[in-house]
Every structure is written in structure tokens, then in C-alpha cells.
């Protein structure tokens, strides 16, 4: 059996529309890479096609994960399928507007420069609300997923909840900055309303492709980290299961479940840490002593908790 045929067999029971959407956005991501190569225009210091590329990759991961999660539901699968269909439609409509603005060399988010730009951003903002509502409903339904492995049981639930938290953190970027408020007070109209950079204006030096500021805080970081808990925690459960042949202690599904819960708590701490760091106008690549101390404490807490779980006495069969 070829790899492609094996993949088709494994994913046959997944929710079809979101599965196809995930695959389609993977192809779109490749096209965005090609666009980056041939179109060297920049916007606010970043390649014009970097944002469509990031959204395509995130969309692919997001829809493939939800396609799998919907297949795990013993009840409400039809409702979850309809909600996931709505996610595909809304996200695709938003993505079309994002690409349209990129092709024009215009910012898609926070753009208030012209009536057309403002209208596009307002429409996208309403779409984001729709995405959040549908994701919230799906997160509630995920609590009914049927998974026999306890580690996966908790990974799916914790991942969905933390992902919703990460999506919600995007609201922090929509508030006007001090400079924008000052411009309003003097009778002006700012071209941009909202920002992802904290402490400086958007458009400064940033990490390649990701674009995260290297000189100030960046609210895209907690948004990204939180949103992808949906993939990280299930992958943790899968990794622990794969290690059972090498580490006999992990053959106990209770041990793996507890390690997943420790990982989920640590991941929640990471989301809080990078949110706090960003709001303090501190770059991800230049943490101060306070941030490093908090990070060290988080790592130590996760490490000690994991050690305690593994070292706890094994269950004795009745």
C-alpha cells in the first residue's frame, strides 16, 4: 500500500468537507510560497504573501484537526458537521478577502485608511465573531467525544478549550493604541485602528515568515500558541503512546493521562506567560530577568509534576 493510499484509508471516516478544506489549504500554502518567491513586495516590513501563507498553514491544520475530532463524536455528529461546514465557509470567505487585500498591497486587519479598506476589515471582524461562536459550540460538543485511551480523552478536551482561549486572545489586538486614540482626540482619523505590536508601531523588525516583533511585544504570539493547543496536546498523547515500548511505565493509560493533564497545565501556563510578556511590550527574543524567572519556574513545575506522576506507585490489578 502506498503512503497516499494508507492516508486515505486512515482518514476515510473523518468529516469530509473539513478534510478536503484542510488538504486544499495545504495546496494554497504551497502556492503562497511560490508567490513569495516571485512577488517581492512588502507591507509594514514583511513580505506581502507571508500573511496568506501563515493563514493557509493554520487553516490546513485547523480543519484537518476538526475533521478528525468530529469523527470521534458518538452523538451530535450531524450538528458538529454543520458547525464545521460553517467554519469552512466563513474562514474561506475571510481568506479570500485577506488574499484580495494582499494582492492590492493593502493591510487586511485594522485597516481604516479608505472606505473600502474599512468595510473589508469590518466584514472580516464579523466573520471572526462567527468563527469564534462556531468554535465555541464545537468545543462544547468535543466534551462528548468517545475516546477509549484516557490520555487522548483529556488531550482532545484540554486542547479544544485552550485553543478557544487562544482564539479569544485575538481580541487584545483590536483595541486602539495610545497613538491612535491621541489622533482621534486631535480631530484626526487614524489609518489603522488596533495593532498586534505593543510598545511600538506595527511594521518594525520581526522574525522571518512569522513576523513576530523582535523589538517589542507582539500579541500574535499568545494568539498563535493558544490556538494550536488543538494540535499540540493530541500530539503529546500520541507521542506518549509511541514511547510505551521503550518506557514500560507509560503502558499504564492512567500515567499517560496524568502526564497529558500536566502538559495541558504547563501549556496553559505558557499561554499566560507569553501573553504577559507581550502586554509588557517585551519581545519574545529579548526576555528580561522576570520573564526568564517565570519561564524557569514553569518548566520546573512541569518537570517536577511529570516526575511525580512517573514515580508514583503502579496500580495493582484487583
Predicted region positions:
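Short, Lys/Arg-rich, polar N-terminal cytosolic tail immediately upstream
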Residues: 1-14
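Hydrophobic cores of alpha-helical transmembrane segments in multi-pass integral membrane proteins
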Residues: 17-37, 49-71, 85-103, 123-138, ...
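Non-cytosolic membrane-interface motifs at loop->transmembrane helix junctions
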Residues: 43-52, 110-123, 150-154, 182-187, ...
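Membrane-helix interface/capping segments
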Residues: 69-79
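Interfacial segments of alpha-helical transmembrane regions
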Residues: 79-87, 144-168, 182, 255-263
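Membrane-interfacial catalytic/cofactor-binding modules of polytopic membrane enzymes
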Residues: 178-229
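Extracellular/periplasmic helix-loop-helix junctions in multi-pass membrane proteins
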Residues: 246-254, 276-292
Amino acid at each position: 500500500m502506498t503512503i497516499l493510499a494508507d492516508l486515505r484509508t486512515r482518514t476515510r471516516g473523518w468529516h469530509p468537507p473539513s478534510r478536503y478544506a484542510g488538504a486544499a489549504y495545504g495546496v494554497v500554502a504551497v502556492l503562497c510560497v511560490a508567490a513569495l518567491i516571485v512577488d517581492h513586495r512588502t507591507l509594514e516590513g514583511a513580505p506581502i504573501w507571508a500573511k496568506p501563507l501563515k493563514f493557509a498553514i493554520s487553516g490546513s491544520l485547523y480543519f484537518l484537526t476538526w475533521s478528525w475530532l468530529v469523527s470521534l463524536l458518538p452523538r451530535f455528529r450531524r450538528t458538529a458537521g454543520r458547525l464545521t461546514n460553517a467554519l469552512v465557509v466563513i474562514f474561506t470567505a475571510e481568506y479570500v478577502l485577506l488574499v484580495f487585500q494582499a494582492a492590492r498591497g493593502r493591510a487586511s486587519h485594522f485597516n481604516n485608511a479608505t472606505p473600502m479598506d474599512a468595510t473589508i476589515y469590518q466584514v472580516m471582524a464579523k466573520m471572526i465573531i462567527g468563527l469564534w461562536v462556531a468554535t465555541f459550540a464545537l468545543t462544547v460538543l468535543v466534551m462528548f467525544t468517545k475516546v477509549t485511551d484516557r490520555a487522548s480523552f483529556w488531550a482532545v478536551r484540554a486542547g479544544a478549550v485552550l485553543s478557544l482561549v487562544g482564539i479569544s486572545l485575538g481580541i487584545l489586538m483590536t483595541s486602539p493604541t495610545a497613538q491612535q486614540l491621541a489622533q482621534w482626540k486631535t480631530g484626526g482619523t487614524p489609518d489603522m485602528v488596533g495593532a498586534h505590536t505593543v510598545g511600538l508601531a506595527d511594521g518594525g523588525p520581526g522574525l522571518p515568515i512569522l513576523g513576530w516583533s523582535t523589538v517589542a511585544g507582539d500579541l500574535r504570539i499568545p494568539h498563535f500558541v493558544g490556538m494550536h493547543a488543538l494540535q499540540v496536546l493530541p500530539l503529546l498523547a500520541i507521542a506518549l503512546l509511541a514511547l510505551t515500548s521503550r518506557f514500560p511505565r507509560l503502558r499504564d493509560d492512567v500515567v499517560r493521562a496524568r502526564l497529558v493533564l500536566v502538559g495541558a497545565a504547563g501549556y496553559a501556563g505558557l499561554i499566560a506567560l507569553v501573553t504577559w510578556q507581550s502586554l509588557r511590550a517585551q519581545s519574545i527574543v529579548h526576555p528580561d530577568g522576570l520573564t526568564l524567572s517565570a519561564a524557569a519556574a514553569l518548566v520546573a513545575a512541569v518537570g517536577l509534576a511529570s516526575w511525580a506522576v512517573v514515580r508514583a506507585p503502579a496500580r495493582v490489578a484487583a
